[in-house]
Regions:
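Short basic (Lys/Arg) and small-residue
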Residues: 90
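Hydrophobic alpha-helical transmembrane segments
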Residues: 2-71, 79, 83-86, 95-120
Length: 120
C-alpha cells in the first residue's frame, strides 16, 4: 500500500468515527440540530462571510469537543469498568469541556445574531 492509499484509508477511518459519533451519541444529535438551525438562521438573515467563518468555527469546536468527550468516556469505561472516583472525575471534566465550548458558541451566536434579530 503506497502513502496515498494509506492517507485515503486514514480519512475513511476518520469519517467512520464521525458517523459513529453522530449515530450513537445523543448529545451529538443535539449539537447537529443546533447546527442546522443556526445554518438556516444564517441563510435567512444573510450573515456576512466573516460571520459564517465564526459560526463554522463554533460548529467545529463543539462537535470536536463532543468527539473528544465521547472518546475519553469510552476509553475510561474500557480501562475502568467498575466505578472509580478518578474515572468519574475524568468523565466529568471531559463533559465540562464540552459545556464550556457550547456556552462559548452560544455567546458567539448571540453576538452574531442579536443585531439581525433586533432589526426585524
Amino acid at each position: 500500500m503506497n502513502e496515498l492509499q494509506k492517507r485515503i484509508k486514514s480519512f475513511g477511518y476518520a469519517f467512520q468515527g464521525i458517523a459513529k459519533l453522530i449515530k450513537k451519541e445523543h448529545n451529538a444529535w443535539i449539537h447537529c440540530a443546533a447546527i442546522v438551525l443556526v445554518t438556516l438562521a444564517g441563510f435567512h438573515f444573510g450573515i456576512t462571510p466573516t460571520e459564517w467563518c465564526i459560526v463554522t468555527l463554533c460548529f467545529g469546536m463543539v462537535l470536536a469537543a463532543e468527539g473528544f468527550n465521547t472518546a475519553i468516556e469510552r476509553l475510561v469505561d474500557l480501562v475502568s469498568p467498575n466505578y472509580h472516583p478518578i474515572a468519574g472525575d475524568v468523565k466529568d471534566i471531559a463533559a465540562g469541556a464540552v459545556l464550556i465550548c457550547a456556552i462559548a458558541a452560544g455567546i458567539i451566536g448571540i453576538i452574531v445574531f442579536l443585531p439581525y434579530l433586533l432589526n426585524c
